[in-house]
């Protein structure tokens, strides 16, 4: 927790890292959930996007020591881990090389969480499940992109995405950390297929808004409420025009 950090680190703006696949990589686009998060924590935390389109958890393991080296200079406040959409690609279909068996997926997530915790024991880690799949939307997207060469059989199904989502939630319970079941949450809304998914997999602005709300909710339920975090430097209203240095003495000197 921030209150447990040494005084020197308290004065540094903490980091929130978004780690995941293309759904994270695209999160800083207009209307993206990462951009919304950065706006919410403006002047209070740095929101960093570490999203890698097409990646599964197996490939993500190779990035851990580069993205989360031991002995980080800046404190990690929180890390979201948002994988599974590619792991759940069906074996023997067009996205076969991205497929990771669900048992391995769960263990890979465990390794990611353990490494992040080793880097920063007080960090808030939140697992996010893969989103639901609109199979008709995926097929329509493939036809519009590849024409007659488009896949005839689905490369992802909503049923399989649900299998991976449940393992993600189960692991979070085992580790005693937070999770966000986006797969279930989105399907609570009638017409979710077109409302939340742009191509049957990736998120519309409305879909991004769901993720943003859920992440901010979980952060606030834990200990990372933006409303309760101080600005990194004084608000302009606290600065005396005749003696500006006074406002900076406690935080900056």
Segment roles from a protein language model:
Residues 2, 6-11, 32-46, 59-253:
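Alpha-helical cap/lid subdomain in secreted, periplasmic
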Residues 49:
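Conserved SAM-binding loop
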Residues 13-29, 53-56, 86-88:
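Catalytic nucleophile-elbow at a beta strand-turn-alpha helix junction centered on a G-D-S/GDSL motif
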